[in-house]
Amino acid sequence: MGKKRIYELAKEINVSSKDIIEKAQADGLDVKNHMSTLDDASEKHLRNAFKKNTTTTKPEEKRTPKFRSSKTGKTVVKKSDHPAADGTKGIQRLKSSNNESTTRNNNNNKNGNQNRNNTNGRPNNNQNRPNNNRNQNNNRNGNRPNQPKRDEKQDRIRASVAEAARMAAQANREIANEKPQANRQRTNSAKPGEQRREGRNNQNRPNNNNRNGNNVNRTNNNNRPNNNNRNNENRPSRPNNTNQTTNNRPANNTTRPAAPAATTANNSGEKKQDRFSGRNNNSRGGNRFGNNQNRPFNKENRKNKKRNRKAKRDGRMKETTNKVVTVRKERPLPDVLEYSEGINVAEIAKKIHREPAEIIKKLFMMGVMVNQNQSLDNDTVELLAADYGIEAQQKVEVDISDIDKIFEDEEKNTTNLVSRPPVVTIMGHVDHGKTTLLDKLRHSHITEGEAGGITQGIGAYQLKHDDKLITFLDTPGHAAFTEMRARGADVTDITILVVAADDGVMPQTIEAINHAKAANVPIIVAVNKIDKQGANPNHVMEQLTEYGLIPESWGGDTIFVEISAKLGQNIDELLDMILLQAEVLELKANPDQNAAGSVIEAQLDPGKGSIATILVQQGTMHVGDPIVIGNTFGRIRTMVNEHGRRVKEATPSTPVEITGLNGVPEAGDRFVVFDDEKSARAAGEERAKRAQMEERKRSNHVTLDNLFDSLKEGEMKKVDIIIKADVQGSVEALADSLQKIEVEGVRVNIIHKAVGAINESDVTLAAASNAIIIGFNVRPTAQAKQMADSEDVDIRLHRVIYNAIDEVESAMKGMLEPVYEEEIIGQVDIRETYKVSRVGTIAGGFVTEGFITRDSGVRLIRDGVVIYEGKLGSLKRFKDDVKEVKRGFELGLTVENYNDIKIGDVIEAYRMKEVPVE
């Protein structure tokens, strides 16, 4: 059996949770609130304890729930919704039907009618009325025979009953006029032995439906809440054909004659209603007489409502007039008024705890007329402070938007310094084994997920060696990612230079050495791939000595470790060297100050928004901290470590991925945590404004000096490109690589570059600009793809940067106008000429060199001078048109639009050949 909570046990044994908690705590059980759980033994103990209490104490009678009427303001007894009417019980005899009786018989008779005892001294006119089914005249009680036709004696009895009812109705009306308030509240009480529901006012209400010509009397006993303020009126029949009545009606709700026992039988014949009996008739248009007796009470209710409204209004007015005006306590003046440049009266009033009107009055007496929003100069502020007898001190303004200065100040903080893990950057040439080394260190498979085996983004990871943490940054090795690698060198403490033993020093190896030296970062050389055939570690050492990296074995200070990342050889030795170098550097940070650090990578996620991978360099970052990163700001919503788990804080040298920024920062931006969100927002907005102004300043305006260059650029063709990538570093790298492509006569024009998937806005821009969209590790959305198909926009998707660069270069070369050069293909000597009308001069000749074609261009040369240049009109051999005549054959030809051909002329045939762009 499972554990049970306190509130569940309280419901089962009908005891409040508070009592159970007090009892459990008194017995030494470990419970705190109603959600605490109990084992089986504790539950059994508490059940027995409260069972004994309930058997020894007398059961408390259930109190009738009361509520305060929203209309009259009086407390009335709340009724239950529906009484249970059971027509199967036997008929019980009425007990104590005396007018002065205070008990009520709540037993149900067999016909479903309930007898109600009158408690206000009125005659009890309730009667048991038959419950006849619709369209049926048979008696539901089978043991009662139908009554025969009335005799004269019964007629006399009925007449006397009607007379008695009329007299009773008249008496009740007189009583109601004298005491209209007597019927406001009716209390019901039951005998101790009777079972009844508390707070119910059972009423016998007739349900008279005239259907199919039969006058069927149906009694529907519905107990409804007794609302004091309802107007007493007999409403038309509802769907259930029950008339609701309230306590604001006269005491004789249904003044029916006290019929003898013979009248309780169900008569199958027609049954007449007494005109003056005051019964509730549910037929439409009924109750012509019974409803008139309620009119005095309706008037009285309206008067009562008016009196109540007037009393409430008078009470509110009285409270307003008697309200005491609180006197504001005057706060003491501060010792020093600290003001800033351009402070106004309203701000001074807040600082010295005085009203602005008082300060304006003082300034007016000094001859200075200002309002509370006007700025005051420093002299006026000092005079005002002297008048109040306090010292004025100008506040030193700090530029909170200069986060670089704040970052440097945080780095210089030398209090509460503790050791921190080293940050290690792995650098090297393409395919020299950087990612494989990190893969071996982390026991994961990063390389398999990289496109083409090349690391396309920057990653940050932590691992533990000898109970000490080491943070690794994996910067990509391709030359296009120079900026990313430079940013990685700025945040690192130690650089591991991976060099393949079979390849030696390569261009990116030299570049990595220069970055590390520029950042004053110590270098540990890892000579990789020593397991391969042809590996020569000594040759690598000789090459690196040219760049100042001399091994310790050769008398230098550079650590060299020969490893095999693939086999895991000497990996532990490399980690030991890293920890040894970290001890020499004495890396420390203050975890108690506000966090500061750098952005490793940033991207826009469709589900999470702006995401930034950051490295905390100083202080401790917490979830919820207000932060400014570059030109963006926000409050940290989530922090995720390299394993994808959420963390609440990040200590120095810890890489985390954060969300909650208002934009995507640039990779390499610095960040600073502020004390409050207001300051962070102000700093972020100010930095964004300054960046926008600098961008506008960088825009090139046409001057006389650069006018010619601008015109020359206008002659050049351009390739409009839109770049979308997964991370900011990839966007920058791809843009720089494309702009470095050199094709004479064509230039790259990047009209838009951003992080994220290719969307409809990008396609719209490309369609308007006739641009090509290049997606790097991203895909277009379904809507964007559909729009691109309809707009004929070219979208090129790539995962490797080489392919993207080559494709754009090919497109640039294809945009140049084709270059043609002339090629001489043949020569014809003219030996005979014929003049034919309608055709012109026909020349007969012999092909001496090459060949001549029908579509080739020709030149007519006479005595070494070109006389005419044009096209062939026709080319024939004998009488047949031919396309080509080769060397050694005779031919006949005509020159288009030229007839001055003479014997001895030479016709040179040529064609224009397209030269490919280099």
From Swiss-Prot:
PROSITE patterns: G_TR_2
GO molecular function: GTP binding; GTPase activity; translation initiation factor activity
UniProt: GTP binding residues: 428-435, 474-478, 528-531
GO cellular component, as recorded: cytosol
Region (G1): 428-435
Entry's localization field: Cytoplasm
Principal localisation: cytoplasm
G2: region residues: 453-457
Keywords per UniProt: Cytoplasm, GTP-binding, Initiation factor, Nucleotide-binding, Protein biosynthesis
PANTHER family xrefs: TR-TYPE G DOMAIN-CONTAINING PROTEIN, TRANSLATION INITIATION FACTOR IF-2-RELATED
Family per record: Belongs to the TRAFAC class translation factor GTPase superfamily. Classic translation factor GTPase family. IF-2 subfamily.
Biological role: One of the essential components for the initiation of protein synthesis. Protects formylmethionyl-tRNA from spontaneous hydrolysis and promotes its binding to the 30S ribosomal subunits. Also involved in the hydrolysis of GTP during the formation of the 70S ribosomal complex.
Protein name in UniProt: Translation initiation factor IF-2
Organismal lineage: Bacteria, Bacillati, Bacillota, Bacilli, Lactobacillales
